Amino acid sequence: MAVPKKRTSMSKKRIRKNLWKKKTYFSIVQSYSLAKSRSFSRGNEHPKPKGFSGQQANK
């Protein structure tokens, strides 16, 4: 069974962790911008949820 010879240093761990965080951050930003562009491509600046008529119900 393969076993690592030495312990990974804290600096290497930190570098690898930061790379992982950076990749996830950019993928989140990209997906958010894509979703934003798709919602605005319909022509509505503020799309309304389904079933919203804009009128208040009478009490």
UniProtKB/Swiss-Prot annotation:
Q: Which UniProt keywords apply?
A: Chloroplast, Plastid, Ribonucleoprotein, Ribosomal protein
Does the keyword Chloroplast feature in the UniProt annotation? yes
Organism of origin is: Zea mays
Give any GO molecular function from the UniProt entry.
Answer: structural constituent of ribosome
Q: What is this protein called?
A: Large ribosomal subunit protein bL32c
Record's Gene Ontology CC terms? Answer: chloroplast; large ribosomal subunit
Q: Where in the cell is it found?
A: Plastid, Chloroplast
The record's PANTHER family line, in alphabetical order, gives:
50S RIBOSOMAL PROTEIN L32, CHLOROPLASTIC, LARGE RIBOSOMAL SUBUNIT PROTEIN BL32C
Residue span of region Disordered: 37-59
Q: HAMAP family, per this entry?
A: Ribosomal_bL32
Q: Does the keyword Chloroplast apply?
A: yes
Per the record, the similarity remark reads:
Belongs to the bacterial ribosomal protein bL32 family.
Tell me the Gene Ontology biological-process terms attached to this UniProt entry: translation
Entry-linked InterPro entries: Ribosomal_bL32 (IPR002677), Ribosomal_bL32_plant/cyanobact (IPR044958), Ribosomal_zn-bd (IPR011332)
Q: Which SUPFAM superfamilies does UniProt cross-reference here?
A: Zn-binding ribosomal proteins
